[in-house]
Swiss-Prot record:
Complexes and interactors: Interacts (preferentially in its GTP-bound form) with GCC2 (via its GRIP domain). Interacts (GTP-bound form) with SGSM1; the GDP-bound form has much lower affinity for SGSM1. Interacts with SGSM2. The GTP-bound form but not the GDP-bound form interacts with HPS4 and the BLOC-3 complex (heterodimer of HPS1 and HPS4) but does not interact with HPS1 alone. Interacts (GTP-bound form) with NDE1; two RAB9A-GTP molecules lie on the opposite sides of the NDE1 homodimer; the interaction leads to RAB9A-dynein motor tethering. Interacts (GTP-bound form) with NDEL1.
One GO cellular component term noted in the UniProt record for this chain: Golgi membrane
Lipid attachment, kind S-geranylgeranyl cysteine: 200-201
N-acetylalanine modification, residue list: 2
Binding site for GTP: 17-22, 34, 38-39, 65, 124-125, 127, 156
Function: The small GTPases Rab are key regulators of intracellular membrane trafficking, from the formation of transport vesicles to their fusion with membranes. Rabs cycle between an inactive GDP-bound form and an active GTP-bound form that is able to recruit to membranes different sets of downstream effectors directly responsible for vesicle formation, movement, tethering and fusion. RAB9A is involved in the transport of proteins between the endosomes and the trans-Golgi network (TGN).
GO molecular function, one term: G protein activity
Enzymatic reactions: GTP + H2O = GDP + phosphate + H(+)
Stated name of the protein: Ras-related protein Rab-9A
The organism of origin for this protein: Rattus norvegicus
Gene name of this polypeptide: Rab9a
Residues annotated with Phosphothreonine modification: 187
The keyword Cytoplasm is assigned to this record: no
Amino acid sequence: MAGKSSLFKIILLGDGGVGKSSLMNRYVTNKFDSQLFHTIGVEFLNKDLEVDGHFVTMQIWDTAGQERFRSLRTPFYRGSDCCLLTFSVDDSQSFQNLSNWKKEFIYYADVKEPESFPFVILGNKTDIKERQVSTEEAQAWCKDNGDYPYFETSAKDSTNVAAAFEEAVRRILATEDRSDHLIQTDTVNLHRKPKPNSSCC
C-alpha cells in the first residue's frame, strides 16, 4: 500500500517589504539573502516535514505586497488551508494594514467560515532594534480579531520561523478533515501480495 501524507497550501500575506520572501526562503532552504527583490505576482516552495506524527507537504506561497500586483496575486488565494498575515515590527503601517489583508484574503479566497479559518500572525524583523509596534499591541490585535496565535520572527537570524510554520500546520490539522488533503508518497509496501482478479457473470 502506498504511504500517504497531507498537502497543505499556506499563503503569506502582508505589505511589500515586510520579509515574506525571506521568511519562506529561511524556512525552506535555511538561507537568508538581504538583497532579495520584491516579489512580482506569486511564487511558491514546497517543504516536507513531520508534525506531531503527521507527515505533511507544505506548499508555501509568497505573494507580492504592492497594491499594483493585486490582480496577479488574488487568484492564488483560493484553496489555501492557512494564511500567515505578516507585518514588520519596525513598520507601524504594515501592522495597521493587517485588517485589510485579512479582508482581502477572506473575499478572494471565498472563505465560507472566516471565524474558524486558521490565521497565524507574524511580526517579522525582530532583529531590528527600532520597533514601531510593541509585542503587547500585536497580541491585543490578535486577541480582538480572532484569538490568533502570534509569533515574533526574524528571517535574518531564524528566530521562531520554524515554530510559526509548524503552528500553521497544527492549526490546519485541528480544523480540517485531512482526507481532503491526502496525497500519495513514494513509499510502497513491497511485500503485499496482489489481489486475484475477480469476475462476475
